[in-house]
UniProtKB/Swiss-Prot annotation:
Subunit structure: Hetero-, homo- or pseudo-homodimer (identical sequence, different post-translational modifications). One pseudo-homodimer of [carboxyGlu-49, hydroxyPro-55]Ml20.1 and [carboxyGlu-49, hydroxyPro-55, hydroxyPro-70]Ml20.1 may exist.
Protein name (Swiss-Prot/TrEMBL): Alpha-conotoxin-like Mi20.1
GO MF term list: acetylcholine receptor inhibitor activity; ion channel regulator activity; toxin activity
Modification sites for 4-carboxyglutamate: 49
Main location: secreted
4-hydroxyproline modified-residue sites: 55
Domain of life: Eukaryota
Domain topic, free-text comment: The cysteine framework is XX (C-CC-C-CC-C-C-C-C). Displays a mini-granulin fold, a structure composed of two short, stacked beta-hairpins connected by two parallel disulfide bonds. This newly described fold is derived from the same cysteine connectivity as knottins (ICK fold). The name 'mini-granulin fold' comes from the structural homology with the N-terminal region of the human granulin.
Annotated source species: Conus miles
GO cellular component, one term: extracellular region
Residues of the propeptide: 25-45
Disulfide bonds, paired cysteine numbers: 63-72, 68-80, 73-90, 78-92
Length: 92
């Protein structure tokens, strides 16, 4: 089987969603494993300041901790925790 035909066959078998836009393979899992994946990837993220979304809210846009997903805690003494069934939250 020629190489071109083999490559086309492989592309038909593999789902396109298993690759990122950069061509890297991504791992998909259930909701419980997503937190672990974010935790393992957080080392490559640049640390920036969090911005509070709304006054009085304990959530800000996440820059400090990948475990919190798209959010983070606005105070430096707070940290992100995960409650089974409830999701991520801040503990201050």
């Amino acid at each position: 089987m020629p190489k071109l035909e083999m490559m086309l066959l492989v592309l038909l078998i593999l789902p396109l969603s298993s690759f990122s836009a950069a061509g890297e393979q991504v791992v998909q899992g259930d909701r419980r494993s997503d937190g672990l994946a974010r935790y393992l990837q957080r080392g490559g993220r640049d640390v920036q300041e969090c911005q509070v979304v709304t006054p009085g809210s304990k959530w800000g846009r996440c820059c400090l901790n990948r475990v919190c997903g798209p959010m983070c805690c606005p105070a430096s003494h707070c940290y992100c925790i995960y409650h089974r069934g409830k999701g991520h939250g801040c503990s201050c």
